UniProtKB/Swiss-Prot annotation:
The gene is rpsT. NCBIfam families: S20 (TIGR00029). Residues 1-23 are annotated as: Disordered. This is Small ribosomal subunit protein bS20. Residues 7-20 have a biased composition (Basic residues). Belongs to the bacterial ribosomal protein bS20 family. GO terms for biological process: translation. The keyword Transcription does not apply. The keyword rRNA-binding applies. Pfam families: Ribosomal_S20p. PANTHER family: 30S RIBOSOMAL PROTEIN S20, SMALL RIBOSOMAL SUBUNIT PROTEIN BS20C. GO terms for molecular function: small ribosomal subunit rRNA binding; structural constituent of ribosome. Keywords: Ribonucleoprotein, Ribosomal protein, RNA-binding, rRNA-binding. It comes from Pseudomonas fluorescens (strain SBW25).
Length: 92
């Protein structure tokens, strides 16, 4: 447990940052989930619209260090790949 006043302050700051970062990570997951739901409905336009909303949020969180930049790139790439697969007619 923190004993000095500065250590107590740092512990308080760390807890505040942790909870704020957790809410931001949750927000990113929600945006990603919305895109995945739109993809699952096989609606390319709706999925694209959700993707367009999600990309700046994902990028912003990667810039702030909330999620790793490679993880952000991976999410964007996979979501975009699924959306493109919806747009291309299935080979019969």
């Amino acid at each position: 447990m923190a004993n000095t006043p500065s250590a107590k302050k740092r512990a308080k700051q760390a807890e505040k940052r942790r909870s704020h970062n957790a809410s931001l990570r949750s927000m990113v997951r929600t945006y990603i989930k919305n895109v995945v739901k739109a993809i699952d409905t096989k609606d390319a336009e709706k999925a694209q619209a959700a993707y367009v909303l999600a990309v700046p949020v994902i990028d912003r969180m990667a810039d702030k260090g909330i999620i790793h930049k490679n993880k952000a790139a991976r999410h964007k790439s996979r979501l975009n790949g699924h959306i493109k697969a919806l747009s291309v007619p299935a080979a019969a």
